[in-house]
């Protein structure tokens, strides 16, 4: 890789340089999207978040520990506000700013991409790619989604992963309760009520 272009050892490639990339236009106009990547054990491949849920996802910053943050195996859970140990402001201020931006700018979108598991099934990279392609190409993604009790939006097509939807909703409630407890006890979120 050209280190002048990729100083952090990550690569960006033009679509014309990728053999099996689609040849059609991918111009989708101006979009402002924050894609958070996590590894859940039960969430669907993609979820759309409202301002409150985006703030909660950002505040908890739940992912897995990898070599990039200290030689992890990819299995140990890690919680880091903003998914980043180098956020500019305090965790509280950074999270507030994200929520305020989303509330003031309805066109700003926040997506949670699950690259972990759905039950025993490992989510393959092709499924993640398909989910993102769907999101960026859909005229209005929410028209193909249903709103969950916690305020997130899930693709109707992804119900196929949950033969017993009540079990999924119970897991979702448990997940929410765990995140709420974490934030309430986090020293940097003294005024947690703004994302309850």
What annotation goes with each model-predicted range?
Residues 5, 11-196:
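Conserved NTP phosphate-binding and transfer environment spanning the P-loop NTPase/kinase superfamily
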Residues 1-2:
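Phosphate/diphosphate-binding loops
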């Amino acid at each position: 890789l050209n280190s002048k272009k990729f100083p952090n050892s990550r690569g960006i490639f033009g679509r014309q340089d990728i053999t099996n990339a689609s040849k059609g236009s991918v111009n989708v106009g101006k979009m402002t999207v924050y894609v958070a990547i996590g590894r859940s054990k039960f969430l669907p491949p993609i979820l759309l978040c409202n301002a409150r849920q985006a703030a909660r996802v950002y505040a908890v910053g739940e992912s897995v520990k990898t070599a990039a943050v200290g030689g992890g195996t990819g299995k140990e859970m890690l919680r880091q506000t903003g998914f980043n140990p180098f956020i500019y402001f305090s965790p509280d201020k950074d999270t507030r700013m994200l929520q305020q931006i989303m509330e003031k700018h309805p066109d700003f979108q926040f997506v949670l991409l699950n690259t972990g598991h759905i039950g025993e099934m490992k989510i393959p990279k092709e499924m993640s790619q398909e989910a993102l392609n769907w999101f960026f190409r859909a005229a209005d993604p929410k028209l193909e989604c249903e709103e969950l009790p916690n305020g997130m939006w899930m693709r109707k097509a992804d119900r196929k992963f949950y033969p017993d939807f009540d079990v999924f909703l119970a897991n979702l409630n448990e997940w929410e309760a765990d995140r709420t407890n974490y934030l309430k006890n986090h020293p940097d979120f003294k005024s947690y009520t703004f994302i309850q």
